Every structure is written in C-alpha cells, then in structure tokens.
Amino acid sequence: MLPPLNKKFSFIIKTAFFTTALLAVLLYLFTPKPDITQPNAYSTAFYDSSGKLLRLNLAADDRYRLWTPIDKIPLSVQQATLLYEDQDFYEHTGVDFIALINAFYTSYIKRSHRVGASTITMQVARLHFGMNTHVIFGKVEQILRALQIERHYSKNQILEAYFNLAPYGSNIEGVGAASLIYFKKPAIDLNLPESLLLSLIPQNPTKRNPIKKSAKLVLLETRKKLFTRWLEKYPEDKHWLAAMQLPIKVYASSDLPFEAPHFINNLQSEYPHLKPGEYKTSIDLNLQNLLQRHAKNYINRRQRDGLSNTSAILLNYKTMEVVAELGSVDFFNNDISGQVNGVRAKRSPGSTLKPFIYALAIDEGLIHPLTLVKDAPKRFGGYTPENYDQQFLGPISATESLVLSRNVPAVNLMYRLQKVGLYDLLVAADVKKLQPKEFYGLALALGGSEVTMLELVKLYAMLANLGVYKDEVILKKDAAVINQNNPNSPNNPNKHIKQLISPEAAYLTLQMLSKNSAVDEISFQKERRQSYPVYWKTGTSFAFRDAWSVGIVGPYVLATWVGNFSGEGHPSFIGRQAAAPLFFEIIRSLDSYGLIKGNIKPGGLNITEVDICSTTGDLPNVHCPKTEKGLFIPGKSPIKVSDVHREIYIDKASGLRACQYDEFTTTKAVYEFWPSDLVRLFKQAGIVKRQPPPYLDSCLINNTSTQGSAPTITSPSNLISYTIRASKLKQESLPFSATTDTDSRILYWFVDNSFVGKVERDTPFFWHPQVGEFDVRVVDNLGRSASVSMRVKLVQ
C-alpha cells in the first residue's frame, strides 16, 4: 500500500498519469512503426569453411556489434536474461506500471536509493532511440516508445532487438559479438555458466566488464546468486553446480583472431558491396595454417641464400574454392612489405605458361606428347631466344622439351600456332591488364607478360578440369551474400565457365607435366603415403626476379612464389631451386594428413594409346629398334609411320652401299636416315649418329633417285614475294637452303631450269635476284628433287 500523498503531489501524479496515458494512446494509434533492428552500424565477421572465426571487424562507429537472429541465441541466454531483468516480460504490454510507480516513489519521493523498473521493451526503446532516461521527460518518452514498440513487434522480435542492442562492456554490443569475443564461440554454443555471466553485464556494463579483474570477481559472485534463483525455476540443471565453482576463461577483444589477412583484405576491397554481417569463406583454416607454417620455416632456413619472402595459394580445382592464401610470409613485417598480397600482385610468370602453348599446339594438331621438336638456335625475325643453361639439346620429344623447359621449341610452337594463340587464351581466361598483343610478340612464351598467382592457378585448374575455365570461389554457397544475382558476386562460380582447350589436349598436357620429376625424387617417392602424380612446372623470370612452382596434386592446384616485392632480382631466385622445395614440402604435408586423394582419369576422351617409335616419335616401322606406349588424338595428332630406320644393302667387299641385294656379295643393315638439319643438331648436341655409307660408283642415278626422301626447301618459302629497293638490286642476294636425307652430299640449285650453282649439304647458296616470277628447284647428288615458286619485285 502506497503512503498517503499530499493533494498537490497527488494532482501532479494524476495529471502526469493522464497526460502520459493520452500521449500513449495517440502514439499507439497514429505513429509509424519504428525500425528497432537497425542501429547505426554492424560489424562484419568472416569465418572459415567450417565456421572458425577468421576476423571480426569493428562497425563504422568503432563498436563490435554483430546482428544475431533470435533462433541463434540459446534459450539459456534468453531465460537467464529474463530471470534477471524482466520476469514478467511475456505478461506486460511493454511497461510494468506497478513496478514503475514503486520505483518512482522510492527514487524521487522517498529518495532512499535509485530503483530501476525498465522492462526489456523499455530498454530496447532507450538503446535504440538513445534517450536520457535519468530525467523525467526522458523516462516519459521511454514509456511511450515502449508502448509504441509493443504495438508493432512481437515479443520474440523485441527480445531479438534487445540481444542485439544491449551493452556487454567496453565497446561490445549485442550477445553475438560478446560471445565471439569473450568466449571465442558463436552465441548458439554458449553453455549455462557462460549464459548466466553474459546476462548480468547489460545492467551495468562498465562495472561488470568481465575483462577487468576487479569487475570479474564481483560478476562471478553475482552469477552465483543468479544461479541459485535459476535452480529454483529450473531444478533439472543442478548438474551444473560443480561447473559453476570452476574459474571461467574470458578473452578480450585484443585476443580476436586475425587469420588469412591478405585474403580477407582482398575480399573486402574487391567486393565493397558486401553489407555488414557474417560470411563463411572458402578458406580452410587448417590448410591456411599449414601454408603459413611451412612458408615461415622455409624462409627461416633459406635466409642465408637470400630468400626473405614467399607467397602461396592452394585452390581446390573441383570446387574452385580458394582454401588457403598466403600473400606474404609475414603480414606484419614492413621490411619485406609484408602487407602486399603476392597472390594478387602482377608478376612475370617465367616459363609457367609454357604448358598452355603445348596444349594449344596439341589442339591444333602440331604435336603429340612424343613428337620430336628441335631445341636448336633459331632466329624469329629480330628475336633469338636462348635457353637458361645456354645449351641446346638438339631433337627431343615434346614432353622432354616441356619438362626441361627448353625455350626455343616453346617459342617455335607459339610461332606456328594459327587458330588460337597464347595471348588469345590469356584474354579468354580473363587475365587482367594485358598490353596489346603486339607489345609482347613471341617473348610472351617466356614470361613476357605479367599475371597474378591467382590467375595462374586458375589456368592450371582449367587443365585439371579438362579445358573448362571457371572462376574462383571465395565465399561458401551458404554464406550470407548480398546481391546473390549479381554476376560479380564473389560466390558466383558460374560467371565465367567456358571451354578454352579441348579435354583431350588438356589431358595430354597433364600427362606431359607428370613426367617432371620432383626436386628430390628419391626421397619424395620414399616419403609418400601412396602413389600419386604431380602435374607441375617451374618458372624463373627475367633477371631472376621471380621464382615459381605451380602444379596440380590430388584435388588441389598449388603455387609457390619466392622473390621480393621491390622487384629486385637475386641469383637464388630460380624456380626449381627456390620455389620448388617449398612446393614439395607442402605436398608432403598434405599427403601426411591424407588430403591427396583421387587422380585425373576421365572417361570418354577421344584418345588412343599406340606403340610409338622411341627414337622418332612416329609410328614404328618394322626396323624401329625400340617402342613405347604413347597417346594421340585420332584425326588431329600428326601421326605417321616412321621412315627414319631403313634397311639398306652393304657391299661386303668395299663396305659401300649397294643398289641391289645379292645374297653372295651384299649384306643387310639398318641405319637411321635423319633430315640434314636434325643431323646437324645431333652433332651440336654431342650425339653421334652412325651415317650410312655412300653408294658404290657403279650405282646409276635412276637406281637412287627413287629411294629415301627428297630434299625440303626451307628458303625461299613457297609463293613468297620479295620486295627489293631498285638501288640495292645489284648488291642483294637471297639465301637458298634445304634439308636433305642423311645420304645426300651435294645440292644443285636451278632457277627456271637454269643451273645457278651447287653447295655441300647444310650450306646455303646465295643467288643474286632478278625481277619476276621464278621456279626454284634443288636436286641432290642422288637425283631427288624439290621445287618452290617465288616472286621478286622492286620499289623505288
């Protein structure tokens, strides 16, 4: 029973009551619905693919505030808060008028001590509208707003708003952020002791800040009292009694994780349309830590060799998810510009683009994996590529040429491509910031352009996906992504799906890459838990600025880079020596965890396995001494029966070559008949090939002209047109050259059937040109011939 009041005070109370009631009715009936779900700003939380927190950002107002729906807030938190703050929450209409009058009398009339009577709804009104409820008019407004809120929102919606607005100490607001910071877990995973602790903080967040030692002791004591009340209402929870006596670990905001920093920074900068909220990324924190650990240990071991920084990325080519991204070895090391993201920075790729030249050449029918290509000095206009070791190996298979990273064969194949070139492929694969095609020329084959590590691994993923290019995925499909219909959304993996290389060409290229041995092949084979291929390639950029290793293993594309963000070169920055060891360390670690599973074994490809003559790369004839299994694409790959190994007749008496077989005077022998240009390359490479002996003098020209291969004119090209200045006509000379069979010795040159000169095999003949159209013919000493047409015209 309230004590009797004097008439004046009674009048004030009645007037205030009726005025408030009138305003409440007007507010209830005519004011629009307030939006209590939207404070000034929310934080953004990024998680790994399994839900581990990677980073929690401050909101725009420098507070941690994370929107958490009511169904993600455990009942223990809801019930503990209502038990402590508002036991009649589900009965009142937003204001507990009896409690309010009692509080008013105690606080303002009796003045014994301050008593609060705010309901959960009233607290939502105060927190949302930011009103000062320590004065009468502020309290009146709070009451009116609470009634307004109750009209427009359900109890669950009001409770949800409270748990997202309530202060939990320092700059932490909302139970979602409080749970992540204080207990390193989402709110839904809070247990009863943690729930009780959190429910006490909003009433006095400054004095009950759990990270303050003095406040924590008071908080724990208050929690014991609340738990006693809890057991009166929920006696079935008495099994928590022992846990309530144990110390509770509480973390501070300074303990928040800062994982995959380059990845998260890029995600935020590249996709600014992402609204604040919670996002599950493609990152696997276990794999991220694996890359970080190996990179750090590797650089520490190799610092004496001049290695100070590295970047790496691991992409699951089946899902196209970036599961680990390491932009630098140390994000916080300013000496190496650690905050630069090496995965997204443009760098010269060195030789890592060569596999795509070979894939395009296979697709165009220029080669198959065992086709012989020429590793020899060759001039392409004003461009003369050289090999890293300054040596030339002569004729080698396309597979050897690729895994040994020979430059001339790669440039020559790129030069011969007619349909789709390497530049066209890079454009189709959405490689950014390319210069015009003419800017690079043939140097593009050797790393003349710049790509990012991410662009590079997507190209290799395209090979693993049998020529199908897809974009990367950096957010999980179930992430709370804004603008899901936006084609540029970061979890829209289907925005760029296209077949860039045929499945057959991609598969054959992978088989070629699998022949590349590991850096330490013997130990690598011993340490493997199981047998699996590694389809990989190294690269070294000009002036030793970048060392690369990139490849496919199991379901992953892995790339490692070693270098300096300053662009300064170092002799140690060689792909196989600097980047490959780290590449295989990571592979071994993945294997040790059983993560390398599966193999690229597609079905339904138009590929045939046949016997190939090991020496020539063609189908074997009956005289080929050794064969091996090889793959080719029927109707596309350049496959023919080899004619290099030929059986000839040797005169027993002289050892010279006979025209016809006689069982008494001749014997049979098999020799290799190589074109003269390849014979020359074998010699340059130090490879000795046994030459067939010359014919007997008694052999007539008509006996030899139909045997073996005719010469092939390499200069001039057929139907070529030469333009010569009139003033230089007398001084000009045009080179005539041809490749011949091994047994050719002399070449005779004719222009319009007029003999113009002779030279030894492999020696060019120089002709002084005339104006007009001409037929040029060459005949070797055995009577075999070839011809081309050419034209010479003058300009003044």
Regions flagged by a language model, labelled:
Residues 23-25, 112, 116-289, 293, ...:
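Non-catalytic, structured segments within soluble enzyme domains
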Residues 79-82, 230, 291, 320, ...:
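Active-site SXXK
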Residues 90-100, 173-176, 236-238, 336, ...:
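Short, well-structured active-site flanking segments
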Residues 262, 310-347, 351, 359-360, ...:
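Active-site beta-strand/loop architecture of penicillin-binding DD-peptidases
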